[in-house]
């Protein structure tokens, strides 16, 4: 019988200044896949079902902590002031983990690509060792810290500048990710010294301290692509390309059809069902779900919305937060939908704005329809019943209700509720003036000619 895994605490380091980003925004809040970098790290760790989440903040702490309230309200934060190295940063979690009986895993808020499989492998290795580090074998070891192994035992981590010629030949390098018993880790961290050129306390000293204390340390390997950290704008650009490539491949493998995958942009939390079709140049912002069999046509932009099975969106559609598109509904070209429910089988085929509204089943919204939902201070709702027909160029001045099976005449401005089955006409009577257009043109031309002579 498989043993129950020990409780786990995630410690996410998000305190660095990120000076190479050349930005007023704290580095953990720069976006990748429409989500803050730190959100990627938390999402990877969430697959391990941690009992506690501790995020170490520092530079821009107020901003980082405010974002954490939205993306991870369960997180406990601890501030590192001043920033004195990675070991010092992890030690700031001691108070939050007081009395915690379980393991602690250290992750980084600027390293978004560690997979749940790799992190789970660390937990498995932890069952046989007191300290587990995560290593990788890069194509170019360069100036990475080296993992000095003796068989299965990790003796120490040596920085490149301090390594002997023999140690520099080692190709097994340090990613910085660590897993250990939480109490043991805090005990070892308390023994760190800052006897180095930077005057900082390094997490990389923990394996050697563990060995000195009679504990065992080891390291497991992951793919180099998982270890990428982001320290500059250029690295963020490369990371975005890597993220998008991975998401496209994963969705195609899961049964999503993409006609030009390199032109489609996904977010961290994009969910798409199999047999959905995504045409070229579609952008998915945060919080979008597309159900099986739906079709998203070219040049559409979606965020904060849900598209049900069989629905068709676009081309050139914009779905904003709160848009709910029902089964087999259609939202066509140059249509914007916000905070609105488009029910099953309804059609909004072109050139319309539908906001703060409900559109009933099988209703048909004509071209140029606008729900006039904002009075300059407050938003108001428009409710359109099932099987209603809204004529082209109708202005629906909210709050207003159009009943089931009702119709509005083209060009109408609707300011009052329309009963079920009624036809509403809200436009001025047309009056034709014979010959007046010819006279008006002649008069205007004479005025223009007179001005030209002046």
UniProtKB/Swiss-Prot annotation:
- List the active-site residues: 350
Region annotation (Linker) ranges:
234-254
Q: What GO biological process term is on the record, naming one?
A: cell morphogenesis
Q: In which pathway does it act?
A: Nucleotide-sugar biosynthesis; UDP-N-acetyl-alpha-D-glucosamine biosynthesis; N-acetyl-alpha-D-glucosamine 1-phosphate from alpha-D-glucosamine 6-phosphate (route II): step 2/2; Nucleotide-sugar biosynthesis; UDP-N-acetyl-alpha-D-glucosamine biosynthesis; UDP-N-acetyl-alpha-D-glucosamine from N-acetyl-alpha-D-glucosamine 1-phosphate: step 1/1; Bacterial outer membrane biogenesis; LPS lipid A biosynthesis
Q: Where is this region: N-acetyltransferase?
A: 255-454
In terms of one coarse class, where is the protein primarily found?
cytoplasm
Cofactor descriptive note: Binds 1 Mg(2+) ion per subunit.
Please name the top-level EC class of this enzyme.
transferase
| InterPro entries the record matches | Bifunctional_GlmU, GlmU-like, GlmU_C_LbH, Hexapep, MobA-like_NTP_Trfase, Nucleotide-diphossugar_trans, Trimer_LpxA-like_sf
- Can you list the GO cellular component terms from the UniProt entry? cytoplasm; membrane
Q: Which domain of life is it from?
A: Bacteria
Residues recorded as binding Mg(2+), renumbered to this chain, are 110, 231
One of the entry's Gene Ontology molecular-function terms is: magnesium ion binding
PANTHER family listed in its UniProt record: BIFUNCTIONAL PROTEIN GLMU (PTHR43584:SF3), NUCLEOTIDYL TRANSFERASE (PTHR43584)
Q: Describe the subunit structure.
A: Homotrimer.
Entry's HAMAP family?
GlmU
This protein is called Bifunctional protein GlmU
- What is the species of this protein? Jannaschia sp. (strain CCS1)
Q: Which gene encodes it?
A: glmU
């Amino acid at each position: 019988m498989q043993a129950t895994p020990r409780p786990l605490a995630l410690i996410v380091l998000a305190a660095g200044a990120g000076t190479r980003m050349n930005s007023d925004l704290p580095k953990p809040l720069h976006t990748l896949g429409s989500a803050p970098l730190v959100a990627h790290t938390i999402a990877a760790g969430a697959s391990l079902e941690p009992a506690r989440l501790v995020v170490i903040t520092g530079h821009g702490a107020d901003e980082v902590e405010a974002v954490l309230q939205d993306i991870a309200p369960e997180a406990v934060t601890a501030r590192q002031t001043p920033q004195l190295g990675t070991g010092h940063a992890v030690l700031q979690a001691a108070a939050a983990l007081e009395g915690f009986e379980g393991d602690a895993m250290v992750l980084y808020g600027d390293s978004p690509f560690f997979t749940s499989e790799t992190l789970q492998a660390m937990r498995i290795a932890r069952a046989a060792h007191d300290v587990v580090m995560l290593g990788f074998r890069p194509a170019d070891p360069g100036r990475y810290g080296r993992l000095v192994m003796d068989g299965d035992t990790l003796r120490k981590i040596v920085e490149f500048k301090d390594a002997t010629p023999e140690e520099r030949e080692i190709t097994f390098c340090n990613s910085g990710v660590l897993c250990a018993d939480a109490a043991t880790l805090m005990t070892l961290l308390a023994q760190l010294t800052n006897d180095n050129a930077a005057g900082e306390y390094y997490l990389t000293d923990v394996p050697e301290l563990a060995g000195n204390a009679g504990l065992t340390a080891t390291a497991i390997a992951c793919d180099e692509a998982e270890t990428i950290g982001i320290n500059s704008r250029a690295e963020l650009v490369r990371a975005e390309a890597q993220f998008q490539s991975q998401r496209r491949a994963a969705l195609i493998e899961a049964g999503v059809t993409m006609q030009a995958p390199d032109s489609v942009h996904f977010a961290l939390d994009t969910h798409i069902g199999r047999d959905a079709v995504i045409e070229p140049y579609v952008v998915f912002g945060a919080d979008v779900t597309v159900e099986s069999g739906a079709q998203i046509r070219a040049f559409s932009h979606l965020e904060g919305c849900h598209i049900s099975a069989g629905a068709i969106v676009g081309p050139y559609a914009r779905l904003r937060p709160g848009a709910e598109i029902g089964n087999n509904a259609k939202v066509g070209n140059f249509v914007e939908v916000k905070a609105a429910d488009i029910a099953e089988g309804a059609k909004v085929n072109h050139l319309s704005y539908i906001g703060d509204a409900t559109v009933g089943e099988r209703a048909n919204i004509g071209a140029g329809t606008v729900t006039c939902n904002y009075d300059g201070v407050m938003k108001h709702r428009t409710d359109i019943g099932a099987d209603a027909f809204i004529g082209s160029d109708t202005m629906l001045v909210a709050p207003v209700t159009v009943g089931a099976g009702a119709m509005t005449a083209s060009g109408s401005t609707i300011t009052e509720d329309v009963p079920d089955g009624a036809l509403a006409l809200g436009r001025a009577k047309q009056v034709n003036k014979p010959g007046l257009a010819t006279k008006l043109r002649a008069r205007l031309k004479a005025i223009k000619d007179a001005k030209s002579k002046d």
